Amino acid sequence: MSTALFDLTGRRALITGSSQGIGFALAKGLSAAGATIVLNARSADKLATAADQMRSIGASVDVLAFDVTDHNQVRVSVDAFEASHGPIDILINNAGMQQRGPLEDFPADAFERLLQTNVASVFHVGQACARHMIKRGMGKIVNIASVQSALARPGIAPYTATKGAVTNLTKGMATDWARYGLNCNALAPGYFDTPLNAALVADPDFSTWLAKRTPAGRWGNVEELVGACVFLSSDAASFVNGHTLYVDGGITASL
């Protein structure tokens, strides 16, 4: 089989929340596959630093600063970028946040922030990009879900709810938009060593538990998400729609 199926040359990929962590790793991976990258975050300073790092390895990079939870700001930003730079062919909805705490005491305003950042953002940015993709009759949307889309642990019930919503919103996107030539899927990481998981990575008891609970016996490295993301962003996934691909070291396969 030719590797041309996975070639992203000539395509432009917007990755939300891509100044660090998983988003930045995916940006580097899609660039290595040939894509032009559009980095996104709220902080212009963080974006500039990330863009400089990308360019130092030869990547073609643009930056687009907007708040993924602000519907109007998202739409205006995406429309203006498409008009000035050209089509966004691939969208990676990666922006997200975590907040832990006992469910019985979890603050309502914190729950709302999780919903806005983890779920509403997928709707806002997905809709803004899909309107252009539909006109062109093609596009790839990859929503970053989580192992918590399928499994729960104490102390993260609100986060678990948001990631379950992402997988179902992905199915809805596929159901509505596949007829227009869009492929909408989700990528669900297991436990990866990222800034979002810094507190867990620093906890030796949790790492010991994770090594026993995960068949692969370890934390994931963010680079190990790249292959799955390139696949879902490429022609190789032309008949894949509404699917959630777990990259989790086997944790969802094992009791």
Give, region by region, the residue ranges found by the protein language model.
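Conserved glycine-rich cofactor-binding loop
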Residues: 12, 19-21
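Short C-terminal tail/terminal secondary-structure segment
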Residues: 2-4, 151, 230, 241-255
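Active-site helix of classical SDR
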Residues: 126, 162, 170
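The beta1-alpha1 cofactor-binding region of Rossmann-like NAD(H)/NADP(H)-dependent oxidoreductases
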Residues: 44-45, 65-77, 108, 223-224
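Alpha-helical segment proximal to the catalytic Tyr-Lys
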Residues: 131, 175-179, 238
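Residue(s) in the substrate-gating loop at a strand-loop-helix junction
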Residues: 146
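Substrate-binding pocket helix/loop in short-chain dehydrogenase/reductase
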Residues: 102-103, 110-115, 141, 206, ...
